[in-house]
């Protein structure tokens, strides 16, 4: 039975953690995750998704929430746990060389490396209209997602939003980590092709700001930034649910309401048409498209804003 230290934080990581802790071939000896964070208007101290899962279901397994992994006491603690592997998935902290050198550190990255190294591989794949994505297991080194690839699995992501792709890739990663660790001694690590490498940065709230220039580009942003940060106009109006109707139509005014439907409406972009199904003004409740227009006394051929 191989001893595992798992390092991960969000729900994506929880899916992988669950697969490991439930598998009889592995023994989870510790979880490392981000410290509890103050959440919401009341700033309630809230544990990470992985910590909440493990403490509720496996309370005897130790959980560590260090502010830094460079602390000598933390490194000593990891040595004392004597793991066979350290598995990392969306942890949110960089592992120092002192830890990387202890045992094989296997990272699960949500892209087909070397494409989309960095913090937002799923959103970047959607923004770039990729129809395929996947997940890789890789041997960690000091560079950002530059380690040798062990195994990978591919899937279709066309017309899926980030939330859906996260769930899809989390399930793939949960399967992949088991095969990678069980077959570790038989796998020949493959160096990444540096000439094909691309980087992606962390998503910020302001990335959700949209205009009505291009319906296809707006739709891709909507898919990429659902559920966070969402997409919103400069006046704060959020589009919560929408569909791409036409990519090419250009014979209407940008922002013109083209047609009212039972619970939605068609909206003209400079290029293309969208169906707006649900939207929300800042500080107000979400409404279906038709109800919103009725409340604003807007009709066909009027401008949305």
Curated annotation (Swiss-Prot):
(6S)-5,6,7,8-tetrahydrofolate binds at residues 111-114. Keywords: Protein biosynthesis, Transferase. GO terms for molecular function: methionyl-tRNA formyltransferase activity. InterPro entries: Fmt, Formyl_trans_C, Formyl_transf_N, Formyl_transf_N_sf, Formyl_transferase-like_C_sf, GART_AS, Met-tRNA-FMT_C, Met-tRNA-FMT_N. Gene3D superfamilies: 3.40.50.12230. It catalyses: L-methionyl-tRNA(fMet) + (6R)-10-formyltetrahydrofolate = N-formyl-L-methionyl-tRNA(fMet) + (6S)-5,6,7,8-tetrahydrofolate + H(+). It comes from the Bacteria. The keyword Transferase applies. Its EC number is 2.1.2.9. SUPFAM superfamilies: FMT C-terminal domain-like, Formyltransferase. Signal peptide: none annotated. GO terms for cellular component: cytosol. Transmembrane segments: none annotated. Attaches a formyl group to the free amino group of methionyl-tRNA(fMet). The formyl group appears to play a dual role in the initiator identity of N-formylmethionyl-tRNA by promoting its recognition by IF2 and preventing the misappropriation of this tRNA by the elongation apparatus. PANTHER family: METHIONYL-TRNA FORMYLTRANSFERASE, METHIONYL-TRNA FORMYLTRANSFERASE, MITOCHONDRIAL. Belongs to the Fmt family. This is Methionyl-tRNA formyltransferase. The gene is fmt.
């Amino acid at each position: 039975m191989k001893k595992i230290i798992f390092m991960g934080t969000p729900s994506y990581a929880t899916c992988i953690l669950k697969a490991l802790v439930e598998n009889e071939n592995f023994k989870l000896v510790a979880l490392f995750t981000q410290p509890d964070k103050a959440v919401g208007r009341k700033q309630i101290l809230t544990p990470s998704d992985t910590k909440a899962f493990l403490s509720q279901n496996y309370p005897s397994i130790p959980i560590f929430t260090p502010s830094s992994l460079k602390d000598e006491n933390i490194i000593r603690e990891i040595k004392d746990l004597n793991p066979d592997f350290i598995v990392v998935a969306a942890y949110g902290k960089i592992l120092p060389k002192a830890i990387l050198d202890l045992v094989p550190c296997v990272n699960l990255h949500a892209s087909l490396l070397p494409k989309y190294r960095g913090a937002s591989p799923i959103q970047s794949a959607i923004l770039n209209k990729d129809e395929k994505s996947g997940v890789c297991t890789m041997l960690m080194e000091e560079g950002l997602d530059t380690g040798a690839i062990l195994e990978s699995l591919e899937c279709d992501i066309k017309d899926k939003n980030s939330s859906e792709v996260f769930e899809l890739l989390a399930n793939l990663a949960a399967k992949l980590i088991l095969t990678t660790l069980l077959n570790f001694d038989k796998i020949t690590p493959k160096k990444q092709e540096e000439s094909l490498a691309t980087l992606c940065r962390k998503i910020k709230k302001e990335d959700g700001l949209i205009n009505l220039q291009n319906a296809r580009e707006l739709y891709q942003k909507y898919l990429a930034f659902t559920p966070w940060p969402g997409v919103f106009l400069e006046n704060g109006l959020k589009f919560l649910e929408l569909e791409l109707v036409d990519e090419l139509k250009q014979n209407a005014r940008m922002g013109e309401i083209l047609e009212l439907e039972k619970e939605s409406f068609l909206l003209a972009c400079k290029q293309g048409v969208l169906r707006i199904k649900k939207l929300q003004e800042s500080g107000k409740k979400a409404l279906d498209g038709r109800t919103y227009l009725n409340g604003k006394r807007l009709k066909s051929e009027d401008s949305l804003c």
